[in-house]
């Protein structure tokens, strides 16, 4: 099993540097104020958390990445409680500190900016690094997936999670390449995909969708999102707010369907909120961000759980 770089091997910064997407829109959706407790289920670089704290709210930040946890703890932000774990388990994590209801939940889905910027994590096809892609420091790595899974299973993952129409061609190329030598680095995999991709010249790198698919699979991101939405719905007090930022159609579709089917969440966004042209120009990662928000309302007891 590949070992992800240890967070203890990297210098820690006293200042968190994450630039949050849709910052003003998230604050407006969650309505932070003194006395309100908000869960940031995807703490990351704590960019959104800082804004919520500045508005007077108390924040419980959850992350499974030890590096993110170390950065947040080192910053010693007042009114911030940091918990290690996956946001899909937020009910159990909060119960462990005696919290059963909160006033808001934020989920900023997918890989964080500083995970993308850290070449050693293996999320990017632009820089050479071990093929890892794990947000936590445990579990199956992307290298184990591409070197061990059957061709049909690889094709299914790439098609379903990457929405890649050339999934079979790419899976075949991966299997052929690994018979010659194990695929161990990001650039190695990206080159295999590029050679297999028909008609590629310039533009969006052909490895983008496959890397997305592998990352989603390795971290069970869509399963975590489904579980996290149910957990958030259960934790929110009446009048509490939920805000979810998705970065691709698979995530946004799950959020949309969940909010539409939930008997206890009233949507506050008829359509997903997107970044302004100014923000897109300033922060390219905001280009695909879509924010949906909802408010918890009272509902009769005994209603069935929403399936998404």
Curated annotation (Swiss-Prot):
Protein's GO biological process: rRNA base methylation
Enzyme class: transferase
InterPro entries: RsmH, SAM-dep_MeTrfase_MraW_recog, SAM-dependent_MTases_sf
Recorded superkingdom: Bacteria
Stated name of the protein: Ribosomal RNA small subunit methyltransferase H
Localization (cell): Cytoplasm
Catalytic activity field: cytidine(1402) in 16S rRNA + S-adenosyl-L-methionine = N(4)-methylcytidine(1402) in 16S rRNA + S-adenosyl-L-homocysteine + H(+)
Region (Disordered): 269-308
Originating organism: Deinococcus geothermalis (strain DSM 11300 / CIP 105573 / AG-3a)
């Amino acid at each position: 099993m590949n070992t992800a770089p240890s967070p203890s091997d990297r210098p820690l910064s006293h200042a968190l540097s994450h630039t949050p997407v849709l910052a003003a829109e998230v604050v407006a959706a969650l309505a932070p104020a003194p006395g309100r407790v908000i869960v940031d289920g995807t703490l990351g670089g704590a960019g959104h958390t800082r804004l919520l704290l500045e508005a007077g709210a108390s924040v419980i930040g959850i992350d499974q990445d030890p590096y993110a946890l170390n950065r947040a703890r080192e910053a010693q932000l007042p009114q911030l409680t940091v918990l290690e774990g996956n946001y899909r388990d937020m009910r159990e994590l909060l119960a462990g500190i005696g919290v059963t209801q909160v006033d808001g939940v934020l989920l900023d889905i997918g890989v964080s900016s500083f995970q993308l910027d850290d070449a050693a994590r293996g999320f990017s096809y632009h820089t050479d690094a071990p093929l890892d892609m794990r947000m936590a420091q445990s579990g199956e790595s992307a290298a184990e997936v591409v070197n061990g899974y059957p061709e049909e299973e690889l094709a299914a993952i790439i098609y379903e999670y990457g929405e890649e129409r050339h999934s079979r061609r790419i899976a075949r190329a991966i299997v052929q390449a690994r018979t010659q030598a194990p695929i161990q680095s990001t650039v190695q995999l990206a080159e295999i995909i590029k050679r297999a991709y028909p008609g590629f010249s310039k533009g969006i790198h052909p490895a983008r969708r496959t890397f997305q698919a592998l990352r989603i699979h390795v971290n069970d991101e869509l399963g975590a999102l489904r579980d996290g939405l149910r957990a958030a719905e259960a934790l929110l007090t009446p009048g509490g707010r939920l805000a979810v930022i998705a970065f691709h159609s698979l995530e946004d579709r799950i959020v949309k369907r969940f909010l539409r089917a939930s008997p206890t969440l009233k949507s506050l966004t008829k359509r997903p909120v997107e970044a302004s042209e100014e923000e897109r120009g300033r922060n390219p990662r905001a280009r695909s961000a879509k924010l949906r928000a909802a408010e918890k309302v009272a509902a009769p007891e005994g209603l069935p759980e929403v399936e998404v």
